[in-house]
């Protein structure tokens, strides 16, 4: 039996191992840099009309946001404006350290889908979630189904809530409450 320190590999095996090793490192680098490149750390990291996904940051009361595709199945928000003051009615916002600017956001609702929506000013962006229509909302939130959407002139039924956004372009959603919140 050969001494393990002197076992020789065929040249092709060493080249293949090197190629596989480089490929793994490339994929890892691409994945980590892609996520970092999409992190939102200031309002100007997102263009008006782009979407962001918001999640809780390490179990704390702060949130993290990343740019994402607007057509994802996850709950996303559309950046509507960067404001130094208040955002519009129904708009939510993100604040950032070292700036007074706010990134104003509109929920990116899809017709026919149900969402958990916070009902009080103490709610968080992470409380907005896609949810089963028969689901149970967290305390302080309600479940709403998006019946229809369109420009600001859309008419909603009397028993529906009309959420209207003016920026980046007129958009309105007709929502039916499915819970007692």
Set out the residue ranges of the language-model regions:
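C-terminal motif of bacterial Sec signal peptides marking the signal peptidase cleavage site
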Residues: 27-30
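Bacterial N-terminal signal peptides that target proteins for export
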Residues: 3-20
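Primary mode marks residue(s) on the alpha4-beta5-alpha5 output face of response regulator receiver
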Residues: 32-181
């Amino acid at each position: 039996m050969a001494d393990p320190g002197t076992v020789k590999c065929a040249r092709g095996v060493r080249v293949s191992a090197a190629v596989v090793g480089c490929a793994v490192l490339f994929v890892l680098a691409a994945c980590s840099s892609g996520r970092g490149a999409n992190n939102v750390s200031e309002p100007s990291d997102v263009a008006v009309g782009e979407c962001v996904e918001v999640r809780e940051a390490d179990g704390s009361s702060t949130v993290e946001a990343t740019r994402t595709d607007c057509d994802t199945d996850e709950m996303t928000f559309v950046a509507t404006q960067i404001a130094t003051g208040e955002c519009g009615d129904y708009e939510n916002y993100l604040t950032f350290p070292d700036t007074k600017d706010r990134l104003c956001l509109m929920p990116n609702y899809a017709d026919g889908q149900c969402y958990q929506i916070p009902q009080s000013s103490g709610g968080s962006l992470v409380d907005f979630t896609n949810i089963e229509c028969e689901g149970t909302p967290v305390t302080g939130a309600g479940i709403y189904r998006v019946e229809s959407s369109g420009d600001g002139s859309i008419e909603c039924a009397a028993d529906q809530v009309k959420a209207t956004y003016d920026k980046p372009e007129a958009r309105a959603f007709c929502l039916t409450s499915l819970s007692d919140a």
